[in-house]
Structures are given as C-alpha cells and as structure tokens.
Amino acid sequence: PMNSSAASDVYKRQSLDMAVNYAKERYAFGRPIGSYQAIKHKLADMYIALTLAKSNCYYAAWALSTDSADLPSASATARVSAIKAYQLCSQENIQTHGGNGFTWEYDCHMFYRRSKLLSLNLGSLSNWREKLVTSLEQSNIN
C-alpha cells in the first residue's frame, strides 16, 4: 500500500504543477486565471491534500521501519489519503483547465484515469476505509 501511495505522490505533484502552470499562462479578462480567488482555492486545496498524503505516507514508512503497533492504521491512513488526494488533484486539474481539461492536447485526462486505476490497484477507497476503521477499533480494544 505504501509503494502505491508513494508512487501516486509523483502523479499528484504533476497534476498540481500542471494546474499551476496553466493558471499562470491562461489569461481571462486581461489577467492570469491564477489571480482569481476560485482558482487560488482549488490550487491551495490540491497542495494541502498532497502535503497531508505525503505526511501520512512518511508516517506509514516510519511505522513499517520501526515495527510499530500503529502499522495497520498508519498504512491504511496513508492509502486512504493518497487515493483521496490523487482523485482531488486530478479532478481539480481538469477543472482548472476548463474545457481543455478533457481534450487530447492536455494530459489532464491521463492523470484522472490513472487516479481511478491506482485507487483500485490494491483495493477501493471504501475497502481501505473499512481497514482503517477495523485497525482503529482493534487498537482501542487493546
């Protein structure tokens, strides 16, 4: 789970970078679209989700390397946050690009489809949420 969580970090970052670059280059009403509050908030949300997912992945890696009792919940948390962050980043990347987001001239659609594929790679989001709940219940019982 952590390998795919870490691998998706690269794709999340590429989605964010693509959206930021497009927001700087694309002009509407004489200003870059990145200067508008709605776009700024989308980019900020993408960055926050990416950073939280990376932090959770680091925590899961630490739990694995130290044989921590938190490993089941840490790895499930890393996977859930990675899936959600990648889906958010790929969706908001498309939204930032507007109508161009689903054209073949831009790679936004590729990141969106890859986010769907990676989310099913080792189990669905609901599956990993259930694993997280189970591991948290077990840790509270002990």
Task: Give residue ranges: language-model regions.
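C-terminal structural segment of proteins
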Residues: 12-13, 82
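DHp/HisKA dimerization-phosphoacceptor four-helix bundle of two-component histidine kinases
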Residues: 38-41, 45-48, 52, 77-84, ...
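C-terminal helix-coil-helix/basic helical segment that borders enzyme active sites and/or dimer interfaces
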Residues: 20, 24, 31, 47-81, ...
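Single conserved hydrophobic/aromatic residue that forms the stacking wall/gate
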Residues: 1-7, 11
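Glycine-rich phosphate/cofactor-binding loops in nucleotide/flavin-utilizing enzymes
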Residues: 100-142
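A glycine-biased, small/acidic residue-tolerant capping/turn segment at secondary-structure junctions
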Residues: 62, 86-112
